[in-house]
Curated annotation (Swiss-Prot):
This is 5-hydroxybenzimidazole synthase BzaA. Binds 1 [4Fe-4S] cluster per subunit. The cluster is coordinated with 3 cysteines and an exchangeable S-adenosyl-L-methionine. Together with BzaB, catalyzes the conversion of aminoimidazole ribotide (AIR) to 5-hydroxybenzimidazole (5-HBI) in a radical S-adenosyl-L-methionine (SAM)-dependent reaction. Is thus involved in the anaerobic biosynthesis of dimethylbenzimidazole (DMB), the lower axial ligand of vitamin B12 (cobalamin). Requires BzaB for catalytic activity, as BzaA alone displays no activity. Its cofactor is [4Fe-4S] cluster. It comes from the Bacteria. The lineage of its organism: Bacteria, Bacillati, Bacillota, Clostridia, Eubacteriales. Keywords: 4Fe-4S, Cobalamin biosynthesis, Iron, Iron-sulfur, Lyase, Metal-binding, S-adenosyl-L-methionine, Zinc. It catalyses: 5-amino-1-(5-phospho-beta-D-ribosyl)imidazole + AH2 + S-adenosyl-L-methionine = 5-hydroxybenzimidazole + 5'-deoxyadenosine + formate + L-methionine + A + NH4(+) + phosphate + 2 H(+).
Amino acid sequence: MTLLEKAKCGEITAEMQYVAEKEGVRPEFICEGVANGDIVILYSSRENIHPVAVGKGLLTKVSASVGMYEEADTVDGEMAKIDAAVKAHADTIMDLSVRGPIEEMREKVLSTVDRPVGTLPMYETLSVAEAKYGTALDMTPDDMFDMIEKQASQGVAFIAVHPGTTLSVIHRAKDEGRIDPLVSYGGSHLIGWMLYNNTENPLYTEFDRLIEICKKYDVVLSFADGMRPGCIADSLDHAQVEELVILGGLVRRAREAGVQVMVKGPGHVPLDEIATTVQLEKKLCYGAPYFVFGCLPTDAAAGYDHITSAIGGAVAAYAGADFLCYVTPAEHIGMPNVDDVYQGVMASRIAAHAGDVAKGHPQAVKWDLDMSVARRAMNWKEQFKLSIDPETAERVWRERSTSFTSECTMCGKYCAMKIVEKYLRAE
């Protein structure tokens, strides 16, 4: 039985107990959430990987994506980025390698990290097909499904696929005249294959085959959105919404078969449409956990898109998004380096936490309250400990202050906390 099937029977598993303790909720709450699809548990057959729960009533999670894209990229170089993501406390890792020793990279990640790993099998399918046929346009549906099963069997916790990107959706996008037609790497290659071969999406027409694989290995499905908007001007157009409607139907089919599923989302969304986007997914996809890429509420911040993403991510988390895919400062302009990865995770974690505070999550609220108490007491060591990035907080303080008992250099002797403590403290 899969985890979802066990939850439907009311069986509380070791994975449910583990994530319940981490989240500060009852195991029964987790079991019920998994059973009705509001919560998914990302876990692996690999003993070194600890489960992570994503969904309604839980802390908002953050995922960091790495992978070999350029010829100069190496396994060791990407592992250094993963180390940075882990140090920054990303909840999950996605290996999105498209070239080089992809299988070696995936095995290294799966055997090294202690948190769930996700993949997008189409990436390796394209690489293998190009080597095998000379062009990825000649790949077959069997190539796609064989790669999905291969990666599922190796212990990945979740796989991203594009089953909702159908020919009708593609023609809808073409007719609408988008500003930026496609920005999904996997989605664009799948669409190119579909149009070249005049063939419907095999992930849609043979969806039962996909479900069988995921059920066999109890892998969480992550429905990727090939039609996610590439700029805020294209947000919530007909193609995006039509794909979401299709995904909603597939969510129900996956659940009925005993497979956990979450839905991925944009991307570029103006601030006033973020809540609507989240609410639409929750409605059309029957409350499935929502995994958003950002969101990015402006297209004009190249070099600072980790900040853009944090702004949109906080709004999305508050509106009900459950999972944030990080965005680095290098987004739209180049491949991220180790520091970019670290900064991207931190920015997304801040967004996730801000959203959790606004939602009134007890752990998040207590964290901020504890920091406020430490600040009033000018307890620097406790403030460092409670900071989302303790190392950076303490480093900056040490560079500019001299004593653990004094005010910081921001206000100096005019420190508001110190003045209040001296003259206005109530006995």
